[in-house]
Amino acid sequence: MSNVQGLTRSALDEDDELFVGYGFLPSIFPYRMQDLYDRSEELTPYVGVVLENQYLKALFLPELGGRLWSLYDKVAGKHLLYDNPVVRPCNLAVRNAWLAGGIEFNCGMVGHHPFTCSRIHAAETKLEDGTPVLRMYEYERIRKVVYQMDFFLPEGSKLLFARMRITNTTPYVTPIYWWSNSKK
């Protein structure tokens, strides 16, 4: 707001408010809350998928939303991401359960997406040159979109490649929000 000659005037144009709240989710339905966890330290096995070459070793956890849990630099001998030794959910996501560690990939809505602590689909495919690709994907039921994440680590590469795709399955414009986060 600005004050011009004693009058209060909005800094927004008259059409700017049309999109205030656009895409806001009043409910997480049809997903159920994930609040049946505790803060105990019991061991729980998770299935991991590894992409590795002479420079890097990447560990993904499809059971925890496809999170890149670990990225290890073999030459420097160090972890490039926050190396959390435990998986301990807490109430920070749209379905409650969220955990710290690695890189989280979020699709569909503001806030940690519905699958941050849920299993998503994982498959192996290949690039045209034969490079293995880890493909993880899921159908997000609120936005009605399919999102796909492809990761590959070619021989001789010092870079882990990520290719993301979001497909709208409806004939309508769908508000979408994509973000990733990590801590080092």
Predicted regions located by residue number:
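Intrinsic disorder/low-complexity signal
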Residues: 14-15, 72, 82
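Extended, loop-rich substrate-binding clefts of extracytoplasmic carbohydrate-active enzymes
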Residues: 15-43, 48-52, 100-159
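Short Asp/Glu-rich motifs
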Residues: 70, 92, 112
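Polysaccharide-binding surfaces and accessory modules of carbohydrate-active proteins
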Residues: 76-105, 131, 161, 167, ...
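Catalytic cores of glycan-processing enzymes that make or break glycosidic bonds
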Residues: 6-12, 47, 134, 161-165, ...
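Intrinsically disordered, low-structural-confidence terminal and linker regions
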Residues: 1-5
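Acidic, contiguous internal or C-terminal segments within carbohydrate-active enzymes
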Residues: 38, 52, 58-76, 136-183
